[in-house]
Amino acid sequence: MNALSQYLSLFEANRTAFESVTSPAVNELRLEAFRMLSEATLSGKDATSLETMIAPDRGINVNRIAMPVEIAASFKCAVPHMSTLLGLIIGDSFHATTSLDRQLPDGVTFMSLARASREHPELLTQFGKIAPADKAEVALNNMMWQDGALIHIARGTKVDRPLQLVKIFSGANMPMMAFRRLLIVVEEDASLQLLSCDHTQDRGEYFSDEIVEISLADNARLELCDIEESSLTTSRYSSVWTRLGHDAQINHTTVTLSCGATRNNINVDIVNPGARSRLAGMAIVDKNMRIDNRTSVNHLSEHGTSDQLFKYVLDDEARGKFEGCITVAPGAKFTEAYQTNRNILASKNARMNSNPWLEIYNDDVKCSHGASTGQLDPDALFYMEQRGIPQAEAKVMLMQAFMVDIIDAVGIDGLRDRLRHLVETRFSGADDRSCDACQSHCRQ
């Protein structure tokens, strides 16, 4: 049976429940997605393909039953030297912290996306306009999502405290899944710093499907850091679609500290002159973890700049993949676009596949791409051992140094030091992998 069939049947049988939580305009997109998926097929059989991830029969909270989770337990880890405005998604349901609404400055909306669709449709003009609805992964989310988060920054608003969105699975006594939707809109001359964290609080079998649409208007700025620390029994399929206005800038860092099977699709459209995109990512995986990062940066206007740097360290039986494409359209003169992937295999059984490429349809550009995969430098290890540093400690130091440029590029003050600590803890093999970069108190 087609992996999509169970979702089409589920939607058809529960259409009233799906449509009860969102606005008529959103529900029109649901029906369009249902019609498209009825004739669609999915491709790909590898561990991080959408078809593989959605094939298992898992529960979904269609009727919006309250999940058995102790929300208070999510706020025990404060972020040193960092004050955030915190929202929480449990499963797929948005929960504002007690003080969030009164702490939000003027011009900032941070709330349930489903509720916003009913109460503030004027803030959802970009919803469904950025992620292409004719792609199966987008259509499936269009049909199935019931909640998520809206972040809207009004024109000229400079948010002086980072927003933090913690997404948690916890407490289910059966395999569970959630379809999440995020809409981030930063209007003209506005700026935002956002820390987004994915966690599972136990070893239940979980799957999250997430679509993120980001709209940056002219001269808007977004600093975004995604951190995942999930269990081996968690699967995650995330797609981010960003559209940049004139002179808009995004700095997006993706950090995978642990996972089961994760696929991150990161797409940027530079549709106006002067826009800048920086994508960075690090993955630290071991055991039989699977991590797959795929990027697509489309230069559709002149004087655009993009830079990509992704680094992986893989140990044990872990598998990694990086696939990145830069496309420069005929009219995108004076484009500068760079892409680099560097990887370390820390065991003989780890595997990495890298496939960066360029599609350039304009001569007046500066573009490059490259990839390398290897082991730790034996000469550097020998040098450190000769100076009395134990081999295990030397390896940790070299792997930390390998990730320095990713961490240093994070534009959220207070987070860089926490990431350095998390990376050191991860490489040292410490049992406690709680994500101190979040205010969630996640124990695996």
Question: Which residues are covered by each model-predicted region?
Answer:
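N-terminal amphipathic, basic helical "cap/leader" segment at the start of enzyme domains
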Residues: M1-A139, L309, D315
